[in-house]
UniProtKB/Swiss-Prot annotation:
It catalyses: an acyl phosphate + H2O = a carboxylate + phosphate + H(+). Keywords: Hydrolase. One of its GO terms (molecular function) is acylphosphatase activity. Belongs to the acylphosphatase family. This is Acylphosphatase. The active site is at 18, 36. Coiled coil: none annotated. The keyword Hydrolase applies. Residues 3-89 form the Acylphosphatase-like domain.
């Protein structure tokens, strides 16, 4: 199990981006969150099996999301097992 935290910049607030991430994350069997940041970016935290996390990160990086993704910066960590669902914050 792994976790990644990604900062997604672009036109990602007010366009359904967080709902998209939550839905995709749940379909992949992940837990985590998608949170609006004050600078207009969205922070995505996802945890679960590495292949599923890589699939979600790939979706974020390819730009096939609501709005427009200009940049994705991700940091990988060991899973912390402190999350129970995928939430939109």
């Amino acid at each position: 199990m792994v976790r990644f935290t990604a900062r997604v910049a672009g036109l990602v607030q007010g366009v359904g981006f967080r709902d998209y991430v939550r839905t995709r994350g749940r379909r992949l069997g992940l837990v985590g969150s998608a949170t609006n940041l004050p600078d207009g970016a969205v922070e995505v935290v996802a945890e679960g099996p590495e292949p599923a996390c890589r699939d979600l990160l790939h979706l974020l990086m390819t730009g096939h999301t609501p709005g427009r993704t200009d940049r994705v910066e991700a940091v990988w960590q060991v899973a912390q097992s402190d999350l129970t669902d995928f939430r939109r914050k």
